[in-house]
Amino acid sequence: MLDGYVSFLLKIKKKWNCRKVIHIGDVVDWSILSYHEKNPSMPSAGDEYQKALKQVQQLYRAFPRTTVMTGNHDDLPARQARSSGIPAELLRSNSKIWETPNWDWRPRYASYVYEGVTYVHGDRGKGGLQAALKNAKENFTSWVQGHLHTQGGCSYFANQDSVVFGLSTGCGINYEAASMDYGKRFSAKPVMGCGVVLGGHQAFFEPMPI
């Protein structure tokens, strides 16, 4: 997580007087558990966990009541367990792993509807440019998603009966970390920020100054 990101989120919460907080996922990276090629200079799984736990606790202290859309990286321990034939009954929940008893962790691929707006992590449905708007059109409901680090912004679509929006929330990753080495070859870089939804009818992307 980028230094200063939690402080930025708190400022946005105060600015808009937000009553509800939804973490769109991923909460953590779990680079060491990734199925992709790994950087040999990366810390061990135990070291990565301890470092990530400190960051998660920063978020938890700032936002003690949060709905969390479990992302593909959040789910890596369970995915690795399945690959190894370990049943889900033997695993700890994300709530226990990250010591967040008051967070409402939703299952991977789940959707969460609040004030008529659908929230998902973003690793299902349509992708590509303006993925959030594509999914809003596909489901004809206002749609908020993350997952795609290089997308942040809101677009609207209307037919003769109603208007929907697609909001991409951006992210708060530390793109200079060793775990993000894979992104160095791409021109597009992560868009830092967060999303704000007002009354289920208006949405804004708030970019983080960097």
Language-model-detected regions and their locations in the chain:
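Acidic carboxylate-rich catalytic motifs and surrounding loops in phosphoryl-/glycosyl-chemistry enzymes
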Residues: 68-73, 107-108, 206-209
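Core catalytic region of metal-dependent phosphoesterases/phosphodiesterases
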Residues: 2-100
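Short, basic, glycine/proline-bearing loop/turn elements
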Residues: 40-41, 113-119
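Short acidic low-complexity segments
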Residues: 96-114
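Conserved beta-sheet core of the metallophosphoesterase superfamily
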Residues: 117-208
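Feature recognizes metal-dependent phosphohydrolase scaffolds
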Residues: 11-21, 27-36, 57-61, 112, ...
